[in-house]
Amino acid sequence: MRSFRIVILMVVGMTLCGSTASAVELRLQLEEGKTYYQRMKADQQMEQEVMGGEQTVRHEVGSGLKMEVLDVDAQGNMRLRNTYNWALFKQSGPMSSVDYDSARQPGQVPVGAEGFAALLGQGYTITLSPQGKVLDVNGVEELQQAVQDELPAGVAGTPMMNALQPYISEQGISELAKATFAIYPANEVGPGDSWTQELTVAVGPEMMVESKWMLRELEGGVAVIDGTSTMKSNPKAPPMDAGQMKVKFDLSGSDRSTTRIAEATGLILSTVSEQTLSGQIHVVATPDSPPMMTIPIQIETSATTEMSDRMWETELD
């Protein structure tokens, strides 16, 4: 009977151990003096109807960063020197086709990809808090000038320049980092816990985003997080310049993602997401004028972000 009770206690103990897991505080804690690497790629397909005709345009944009941690202050805020070490820009559509990958075509730059090629070796400094907040961005003017010096005349308003803005403007760099590091919860979380955040992201059209994340599991020092987001255009955002035109966006959609974060450093090992947006683009003369043209549009985007403390030996899928 005693041995039976011991077996029961062992079973109960194993059951309890299997059903509970310690909560963790997920924070970005990069080590001063160390170097990390980031690469991200977005594959986007747009279906739009222009003057009664259907058009399909596909964009593929990618970038890689060497992230050197210059210093970490007493509050844990990290100042990084980010240097572009990889660039990708591909576009296919009715007007033009461009195919550039610096990893596969070193020294060979097709027309329409000059701006992305000019990123290589250029960079900026950025300060991030342990909660992933962007505190400061510096060196952007020098970055812009270095890229501008490599560009041919007449590229303003081209698809390449529009796609390049998040990588060479202070607002774009800040917004891209904000969207990348927005995931950290305010408090400790355990498996099954969820948290939410609302933010406005202006990488391209200004979007209001409501996100909910849930910690699925803790395994081998890695936190696996599932995310869902809903998004819609900010109706108060000013029109965007598009060459000779101005455009306003009326879009809405959703995003689903899975993120893996290293518990020890808070490094985002990977994020894979699928996003769908649909709605209309309004071509306008002034912010308050009625649309001169309305373009129905649907956008499907697959995106991947990876970070590591060493360079990858394989290409990003």
Task: Describe each region flagged by the PLM.
Residues 1-6:
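Positively charged n-region of N-terminal signal peptides that target proteins for export
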Residues 7-18:
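Bacterial N-terminal signal peptides
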Residues 23-317:
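Signature of exported/secreted
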